[in-house]
A protein has these predicted regions:
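Extracytoplasmic "Venus flytrap"
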Residues: 10-60, 64, 68, 73-91, ...
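Hydrophobic alpha-helical
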Residues: 99-119, 188, 202, 206-267
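Hinge/cleft segment of the Venus flytrap/periplasmic-binding protein
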Residues: 2-41, 172, 176, 180, ...
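Structural recognition of the beta-strand scaffold that forms the well-ordered cores
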Residues: 43-47, 54, 73-75, 99-103, ...
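Hydrophobic alpha-helical segments within soluble ligand-binding/sensing domains
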Residues: 26-28, 143-169, 183, 212-214, ...
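Flexible loop/hinge segments that line or gate small-molecule binding clefts
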Residues: 107-108, 112-150, 168, 261-270, ...
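Short, solvent-exposed amphipathic alpha-helices that sit
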Residues: 53-68, 151-155, 179-199, 216, ...
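Short beta-strand elements in bilobed, periplasmic/extracellular small-molecule ligand-binding domains
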Residues: 66-79, 168-171, 192-210
């Protein structure tokens, strides 16, 4: 995707409260690139889940590694499970890589998962989340994220537009300590509370695992049958929420979520329940994680926290959303539904 210029004000801050750098600041000179290529580095990549969004992260990382002659020797997926993540990191450690990248889970207790890696000299770069107690440039190189506050604001604005600025809504959010999801969810709730006095969040349903979202939604819709909209933290649980809403025959409910996914996009294209998706640029974030690791491997000072753009996707700009967010054309069935 084409580079996006930094906004006048960057709203994202790192876990320590310091302002984030803009993602286009990450670059290597031709001489630095040649130096990295000559090192024959190796890397391991852990997916967060089996989503199109995370796959775009992986593709970005792979493309950057190819450009820098970094060989990917290990790959895993944690499905947001800190126990599985610990197992994956142990498997990665056995491969003796130079670089490991992932999104840490359950931040207050996950440091022991990563301690053996950095203590062995592995360069750690993270997606959005940082283990509690870790300092950039010490235990890890840096982390890259989306404009997480802006995504929450965008979601609130799309919800308000969809329900006419008034009525009851539900919010299905991440219950665990997850810096990026917690920040995005909180920004949504804060914007609704402060900017839309005629919209009431009837209840916030928190999930620890995405597969809990359907049951939570079903229970809350029984409790609050008059809700006009549902906000869902991100697209994976949103798929289950969407199926639940459809099974109940609630074609009237407007759903807003975050992160592009074909199931959600197809429903949007068909004029279904999903009316807004707050999006970011996962390909660019995957690419950036590889660059940050390369910085550390050649001793170049790296920003501790880096952010990248967010934007609203509705039915009107869905095709462009695919290009900007995932760096691909929308699937044929999504294109057909838009033209139908």
């Amino acid at each position: 995707p084409n580079p996006v210029e930094a906004p006048e004000t960057i709203t994202t801050v790192g876990p320590d409260g310091s302002p984030a750098a803009w993602y286009t600041e990450l670059e290597l000179t031709p001489e630095e690139l040649a130096q990295v290529r000559s090192m024959n580095l190796t890397a391991c990549f852990e997916l967060i889940n089996a989503s199109e969004w995370d796959n775009a992260n992986l593709i970005g990382f792979q493309d950057a590694c190819e450009a820098m002659n970094i060989k990917i020797v290990g790959q895993g997926c944690c499905d947001l499970d800190p126990i599985q993540q610990k197992t994956n990191m142990e498997s990665f450690a056995a491969l003796n890589p130079d670089i490991v990248t992932c999104q840490p889970q359950d931040l207050d207790v996950c440091a022991p998962t990563f301690d053996p890696l950095w203590q062995a000299g592995v360069k750690l770069t993270f997606m959005s989340n940082v283990p509690t107690g870790y300092t950039a440039g010490k235990e890890y190189v840096g982390a890259i994220t989306d404009s997480i506050v802006d995504m929450g604001i965008d979601s609130a604005e799309m919800m308000a537009d969809a329900i006419g600025g008034e009525g009851e809504i539900l919010a299905i959010t991440v219950a665990d300590v997850n810096y990026v999801c917690n920040t995005r969810d909180d920004a949504f709730l804060k914007t609704i509370a402060e900017q839309y006095p005629n919209i009431t969040v009837a209840e916030v349903g928190g999930f620890s695992s995405p597969n809990e979202a359907a049951q939570i939604t079903s229970a809350l819709l029984t409790k609050y049958p008059n809700v006009k909209g549902i906000f869902v933290s991100y697209s994976t649980p949103c798929i289950d929420v969407l199926q639940t809403v459809k099974a109940l025959g609630r074609t009237d409910i407007k759903i807003v979520t975050m992160d592009l996914d074909t199931t959600c996009a197809l429903d949007m294209a068909q004029g279904g329940n999903i009316v807004g998706i707050a999006c970011d640029m996962p390909y660019a974030m995957g690419y950036g994680r590889a660059l940050m690791a390369a910085y550390a491997c050649i001793g170049k000072e790296c920003p501790g926290y880096v952010t990248s753009p967010s934007f609203k996707v509705t039915r009107e700009n869905l095709l462009e959303g695919y290009r900007t967010s995932l760096g691909i054309e929308a699937p044929a069935d999504v294109q057909a539904a838009l033209n139908g």
